[in-house]
From Swiss-Prot:
The keyword Hydrolase applies. Transmembrane segments: none annotated. This is Uncharacterized HNH endonuclease L247. It comes from the Viruses. Disulfide bonds: none annotated. It holds the Pfam family HNH_3. It comes from Acanthamoeba polyphaga mimivirus (APMV). It is an enzyme of class 3 (hydrolase).
Amino acid sequence: MTTYNLSKKSEIWKEIPIEGFEKYMVSNFGNVKNINTDKILSQSNRGGYFSVYLKPKDIDAQQKKIHRLVALTFVKNKDPENKKVVNHINGDKLDNRAENLEWVTASENVQHAVDNNLITMTKRAVIQCNLKTGKKIKEFESVTDASNETGISTGHICDAANGKWKQAGGYAWKYSKKDSAKIDIDMSKFKQLVDFPNYLINNEGQVYSLARKRFMKPIHRGDSGMNISLSEGDKQKTMLVHKLVASYFLKKNNDDHNHVRHKDGNRQNNNVSNLEWCYLGGMDKHKPESHFSHDYYDEKTAIPLTERKKAVKTIKSSGSKTSKSIGSKTNKSAGSKTASKLGSKTAIKSGSKTTSKISTKSGSKTAIKSGSKTASKISTKSGSKTSKTSKSIKYYEV
């Protein structure tokens, strides 16, 4: 996580705009305090996000995520009906400065993570043990491998390995102590499901759940093919994997086509290269009583894959009016009208009478002045490792 030197003089405090929480204030830096005691409250890391316990009027204490409190108080939401998710612009979930937050839709939030490579896949070895003796039976490279060999669902194995359940499939399970292995997966090949934004699918038929942090295991339903159960809040739906793949990666050449056929006859081979749209008599896509006959095709998403451009990871100043990019000298001050970038890398703002340091690749040393009585230093090392402003979210493949 990047450390920022933030001046107290540029810290702005406002009351939290939630009914019943009037005695609390939050700052644009992500601090929370009690108005009556003027005491800044301690925060805890819960699931990768900083949160704080607040005691509203006549109600038990509630846990609130800091980034949502800051966004509700300082970040304008132009489309509150659709944009209900708070996104960290630089990818660092612990950086809760107001200028690093934005309101987005669930789809935009996932797409941001994919485009900026903030989803890192790893696989974690798991050990199958005798339920009575605890003796090791076999070690698998991943929960997926264990599930494929034993027939026990990945979810049940994970719950047992995490201690939620004592057993899964009649066996005890635990994770191996050896380091997790990183999987080289190109996330740019995945597309987000329109009606279920917490799921991604690629042209090989792999479906990844962002909520469960694992690949989903399809169920083989005989002649129907492989299907998968998706959920979003109270909404649940079972879909055929091959039709999902065709919907998102295979364009129809004829509007009369209403069926997806497996070229090799193997209904478990859902790679887009093995699928084709065709016409099947007797099927009426306007009759929704059978989800197996439902037409998932959406021409907006069924397009050839294009090379995604990675977004430039910059930190925008919420109070700035003008942005400039120059090659050598940079002016930058907290609350000023000018925000600047040095050589496409982001310069970190410093407050009045505050010294801040950042690391960047360059061949020389540059001293820059920012604001009134403020000095900023840039330490440079050619060919050395530089500090990153973004932090990867680590997901485990099971």
